[in-house]
Amino acid sequence: MKVTEEIYFYPWESYTQNNCNSILISGEVKALVDRGHKAPFPQLAAQLKKDGVDPHQLDLIINTHSHPDHFEASQDLAQHGVRVAMHPEGEEYLRKMGPMFSRATGQDAPQIQIDLHLVEGELELGSKKILIYHTPGHSPGSVCLYLPAEKVLISGDLIFAQGVGRFDFPGGSGAELKKSIERMSELDVEVVLPGHGGIISGRDMVERNFSLIREFYFPMLE
């Protein structure tokens, strides 16, 4: 699904399609956000090719966090020379907690080198500027990506349409999740692309979604 001229959204539609939403940031430098599990990746690869992108020619994989359902398949593209990025606390979590987390979900822990640490601040993809925000709560190394020119927020598993990310996994924190959500609510956003579920589109809908989260979810995050 084309969101803007250079942003494409690939929703999680079924377990044979993928297991999380993936986002392509196109342009001079091509980055795929959250590749998901490796088993269903051929379906996502086919969609990318329809949009004119060879997955093996991507420049960067950006991981919003290091839970297997968003990150696992990154290792396959890395073997083709695609660089892999995540927050340094995400890498630490991957090394220390990743094997246990993967075993608990019946998977093998990915063995992969992280080429780029996503620290808070500006990330340049060619002429495109992305602001990286460290947004812990769902996991210690979670990040959100904000594209100010397009007013697009890529929220990972921080917020969804009428929902928030789980905070009961190892390293999760309801209090940190709440702080991170409040930070993101202050941005000038017209489109939210979450890690699961549908797009939140339109400034009014984005603001209403944050209001709903404050009313119904914040009391549980104390």
Annotate the PLM regions:
Residues 30, 37-39, 100, 129-221:
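Metallo-beta-lactamase
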